[in-house]
Amino acid sequence: IRVMDVKSIDEYKEYFYKTDHHWTIYGALAGYKDICDMLGIDEINNLNIVKHKNRLYYGSLAKTALNDNINDYISDVDIKLDYDVYVNGKSADSLFKPREIRLDRSYKYYDYYVQYFNGQYGNVVYDYHNNDKENLLIIGDSYSWQIDYLIANSFNKTHVINLRYDEYKNKDFN
């Protein structure tokens, strides 16, 4: 199994947030490219990376230490893809929010990562209506939130299951 090859401390700093355990969009895209290679699918090229500097981000590590000496900014790609999304079997129009930083939160350690990337759901389905393509099952966690919809672009329906939430929590999966 091929894994992401981080060649230097500078590359590591680019791939991962300073204040959070998650990867930045740069790390996520490196993982996305590796997954595309493994699955034999074409990656989406020329993705425009944006860093949302309208709100300081203090991730899980900063929150644990209650340390605000270092901050990050949420980073993402600026792309609009045409798909329908379902959360736990229901149309997600009211659940899945646009990828935007909430500016109405005053708590310094608010989890913008979860909010921005629509986390905390056990079953998300992306339907690209590519009926001539296969379906895909992703067993993922919070690291998949940044790229699952990009991977799903190469398939008809993609089911993203997070075993930590909802109906899968502490149960057998069959």
Question: Predicted segment positions?
Answer:
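Extracellular glycan-modifying ectodomains
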Residues: 1-174
